[in-house]
């Protein structure tokens, strides 16, 4: 061996510190062994320092999460060595007695267990500290006394006494007391930890513990075993089950000798709830990796100190282990760490090369997703209408009779009766024509119920109906008309072509004419006529409401408003009323089916008695003409020969029902023929109206037709029966947003609308161009704002990717067919390009410790890339890919994500956590197969009192035993039949076929996080289910059918100095509740009023009560959702729940919870889905989406405020430039903001 003596001298001086640096040492051949020892020790020390440096560099790759509830884990691969617990570790676990190392475990089985804990959680209390030497002791005695046990509540209090007998016969006693609440079973075990030299056995078997019994021979000298000797640290343990002690409430002493202890695996596990720390040191057989883990329980983080302190403790422990390495161990360990680092850097480099392509493709992929959304979503369109004096009529069944009359059509037709204003009336009577047959078939009282709908107006878009009731009944009258034939006389008009053939006796006779009148159309189209009542009739018409039904509406309209007035006219009676409110409605008609539309309540009643003798009064009368020129109207008399004579005559006005007198006188008492003329003037009853051509007959509610009632010789074509017609007039306007079925994409709708507008504005093209210029300016401002938002999002990583990207797509869609569409797309591409540039910059921060120049070159020469930036970028990329069910392999060449191939890489950065969340969030079934219970635990979710600290909202479904059953029966059914663990697996793989008849109650929670400002978040925790608490005060239970829930909000403030979080429950007003709402929520949750408690105290109790329900249930499903609209749908069900059609077997609480989960995941609900619930959720989701599209969301609100500020600043700059005469600045502003000035 060649020795460099000068080097040895320098190292001896530096290492030993015994001789000054200038001192020379004479080395002889006899000193060869000493030199070898010194050199070996020096090399080992140098290698150890280098190894610790490698560990430190690995630690730099590990990002320390600052999110509350994050469970810190660090795993460092080290070679297997033997390690013992030292003084520092025992100080951490609060040991307090210096004697032999003994631990006892008390296991509490409870029904009040957080969902993230095992059912049987062992609480291990270490109460002895090790000493430098472990003295031998012969035995120890354990005494357990039950001090108190409440079987109903599950509260238990135990007294534990341990007596140790040492080898020198010394005795040491230790006593302590255990107390716990709501426990169902208690078992106690204890561990004896000792260094062993020999284990003989097995000597028997412990049937209760199902373990063999070994004889233990202890090392006599008590020295610590070494690695070379092959001796190891073991634990011997014994379990004492004391269920019977608790159940029987007995006091029992248990004594166990050392030789009866059972041999366990050599693993030490300690958990001290006081210090809130869990240190696990595992030592398995040589040749297998030795792992050091330190874990901090998630719900106890705040009291355990910062993560940095925890990391430092682990690294200190690792340094102590490395200090025991030999030279060969160091070489193996160093190679292992170098390989890990190299492998990690290469894999990171392979994935980093493709990240720019991910971001560039995001826009197109998300547009496809939005396209699919619109193709399957109900759209609300704004609709408005106006009716201006719209008049119509429809017939009502009445007992009527016909009056035979003829008239000649001459001039304009009247609006109601079709009788001309100047018609000539011809009455006739010959050969019994005037006899009236009994044409009325009595049918008794006629009543139309209040479900009757009358269609009064209709077009292609909507139909208007009146909902009314109608009743009529005959009134007793002594007058019966037309019982005999008319006299043999024919009265004709001189203007008509007819032959005078009738005769009458002369000689001063007075002839009484009782002439019924029946108007008759003298054309070939229709035979019209006037009907009059046969006898007096009482009529009552009551209109309840005006209904407007939209033909294509699929559910209830929203944002309704309007005003309608209605006037009814029946005969000579008229009434009017006004309705000032509009509200959504669903109604079903007999002929037209179901409608969704609007209702305008109107309370209008018209009552009258129709009397044939007095109904028309003087409105229609038969009068004489003015015989001014009698020569043209001479009476002709025949007395044995024709010789003309002129006589006086008079004909007074008379009513057509009561008759009148015509007095004829002649000079001779002979038979003569007379000719004269009469008129029938028509008084118009309704002025200034527009008559509607649409006239719909009444639905035959009574099951009769016109032919069965009117049994005369005429056909059913007889129309315009004035005296049995209800005339109406509607005036007013309304507006609403009407739901239409899924249609075309927004861009296509925009194009169609653009074409329609162009057709309308051809006559005003210049004005329209100005308006379009303003719109384009607004679009450009929005795109500029969104570009800034996009850049801010990449940097802050606080906003939701979906919200911003959706706004980008919307703006591009709106401007797609406009003049500046190319600029819009260019601006959007520029935003994406800048984001890619920034991404490339932050991506490189993770390589700050890299020494490989080739890798740096491939990573574009950047200097820095942090794990946090890598994880954030992964969120952007994966959300776009998963939204359209695409894989990274479509855009990447190379390996799978690291978490699938190399578990070591899980602890380098957060990339694998983002991969898992994206796989799980978007219901990608192929990737979800890689999601296991172990990997899900790395998502940092908290199920009990905190919030979800993931980047996505979380929806969780819980099952718990039925509360109305006996507790033991309910728990047994829940555990044995429902089987929550099996149900959880089934929900992960096959949610569509999960049964819903388990003997358990189901409910759900939805938690999301809204970034408020730097270091502050608003957390909303929504609790929803069937039969749960509600703000309406309904009684709740597991069997009730109503939908209930509550929304509780918290503010989370981060203290960046030490990484802690502070959670404050917000006031009930922040959740949108009033004091009355809180009172009702409290009474529905606890079944009492809470007299004497303040509203704030009740709100706090409600929060704790909801937490208790969640903690005591089993979580069977946990989904991470990307859409922000799910929370608004849940709020709609909580605040305005629809009627739930509950069925214990077919549609119960489990159906409700699982179907809401399916809808939130984007799947179709089951065939048990309640229509009203689905419509309400879809309605709220669409309203929120349309608010975004119409610029009414928070995003656009912020954009609007920024735009207003920008415009104000531009306007001020423009005015200042004009005042100072800066023409160049004025021109620049005018060009930049064309159309604004």
Curated annotation (Swiss-Prot):
Catalytic residues in the record: 1001, 1149
Keyword list, A-Z: Capsid protein, Virion
Main location: virion
Subcellular location: Virion
UniProt cross-references to PROSITE patterns, sorted A to Z: PPPDE (PS51858)
InterPro entries membership: PPPDE_dom (IPR008580)
Region forming the signal peptide: none
Protein name, entry field: Putative structural protein VP3
Source organism (scientific name): Lymantria dispar cypovirus 1 (isolate Rao)
